């Protein structure tokens, strides 16, 4: 009981596409099913904790390498399936797929309910165009969303280039 046995998952978005034809970022029925799936996982780990007297938890896995490996294997075994194996990787955990265009607010609203179900670990990522170091309001907006939606952990990714030799900075790619 000195540690935690974590049960993680990747590819919820692709699983939902397979089951209902859309992922949770684009469809309320898919969101409802996604929450049911992860709630089931949480309930099971709670049962395991009680039964085996060990600490179990569900974690929203950030597994870029594994997500690619699973997709390659599934593509080999099942072929090219639109919306599922037609990309190079599965989406991390309960994230809205990066290719799906939606606002940061919509992404937060969709992903936030999973944070309470994945107490073993989770993260909310926001991609911001350009250099956010000169736009602190963009960062504060993300912090406000975390508070509003009761998110446990978040990160803001933004484009910033800096030469370590001369110190030149820009936000061009």
Language-model-derived ranges and their functions:
Residues 1-173:
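Long, C-terminal-biased catalytic regions of enzyme "large/alpha" subunits
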């Amino acid at each position: 009981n000195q540690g935690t046995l974590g049960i993680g998952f990747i590819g919820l978005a692709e699983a939902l596409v397979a089951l209902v034809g859309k992922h949770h970022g684009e469809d309320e029925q898919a969101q409802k099913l996604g929450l049911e799936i992860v709630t089931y996982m949480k309930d099971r780990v709670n049962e395991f904790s009680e039964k085996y007297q060990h600490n179990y938890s569900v974690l929203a896995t950030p597994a870029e390498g594994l997500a690619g490996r699973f997709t390659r294997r599934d593509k080999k075994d099942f072929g090219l399936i639109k919306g599922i194996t037609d990309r190079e990787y599965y989406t991390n955990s309960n994230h809205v797929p990066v290719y799906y265009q939606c606002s940061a607010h919509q992404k937060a609203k969709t992903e936030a309910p999973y944070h309470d179900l994945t107490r073993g670990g989770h993260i909310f990522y926001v991609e911001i165009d350009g250099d956010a170091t000169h736009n602190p309001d963009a960062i504060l907006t993300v912090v406000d969303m975390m508070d509003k939606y009761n998110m446990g952990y978040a990160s803001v990714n933004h484009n910033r280039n800096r030469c370590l030799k001369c110190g030149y900075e820009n936000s061009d790619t």
